[in-house]
């Protein structure tokens, strides 16, 4: 036969303190699912940028790139100032939004703009200094490959390649230099 609870007050107090301690530890050290090395691989691109055509050094746009949702999302807001990416017949210049997220295995970008529609890209860093994303499905019968390279001076070079769908025959389509907007 077991003794009534009142006869084991020390055990009851010990169990209560242990339970409170476990609960306090859980409350003090919450898990941040997006604070991993992989989730920081695109941090070099976060900032306010002036965007220049690498060939002419002409200012062609502005891009605001920021982290959202506890650092889980990298969001891009691009506004072009020139006709560099204007689609024929469209009365206004390119503006668009990119939402980037590391999914545990690779980076995904969902891009939508006022010219070309929507593109979904996927990829990872390559060679230790460049982020490389490729379109998952063709857009207008073309594949797209984007490469962001961080430079020692703090600038970022964005190379854009296109290829006929499924061919892997990449041609340089755009070469942009991102410089901090001061």
Feature map (PLM): residue ranges:
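Bacterial N-terminal signal peptides that target proteins for export
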Residues: 2-11
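Bacterial N-terminal signal peptides
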Residues: 12-21
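Hydrophobic small-molecule pocket/channel-lining residues, especially in calycin-type beta-barrels
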Residues: 26-182
């Amino acid at each position: 036969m077991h003794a009534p609870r009142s006869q084991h007050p020390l055990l009851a107090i010990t169990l209560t303190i242990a339970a409170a301690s476990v609960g306090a530890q859980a409350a003090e050290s919450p898990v941040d699912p997006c604070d991993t090395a992989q989730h920081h691989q695109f941090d070099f691109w976060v900032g306010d940028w002036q965007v220049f055509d690498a060939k002419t050094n002409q200012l062609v746009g502005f891009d605001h790139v920021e982290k959202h949702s506890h650092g889980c999302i990298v969001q891009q807001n691009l506004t072009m100032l020139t006709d560099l990416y204007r689609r024929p017949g469209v009365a206004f210049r390119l503006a668009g939004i990119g939402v980037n997220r590391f999914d545990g295995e690779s980076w995904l970008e969902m891009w939508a703009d006022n010219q070309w529609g929507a593109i979904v890209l996927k990829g990872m860093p390559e060679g230790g200094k460049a982020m490389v994303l490729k379109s998952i499905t063709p857009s207008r019968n073309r594949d797209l490959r984007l490469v962001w390279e961080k430079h020692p001076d703090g600038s970022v070079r964005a190379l854009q390649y296109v290829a006929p769908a499924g061919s892997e025959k990449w041609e340089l389509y755009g070469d942009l230099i991102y410089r901090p907007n001061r």
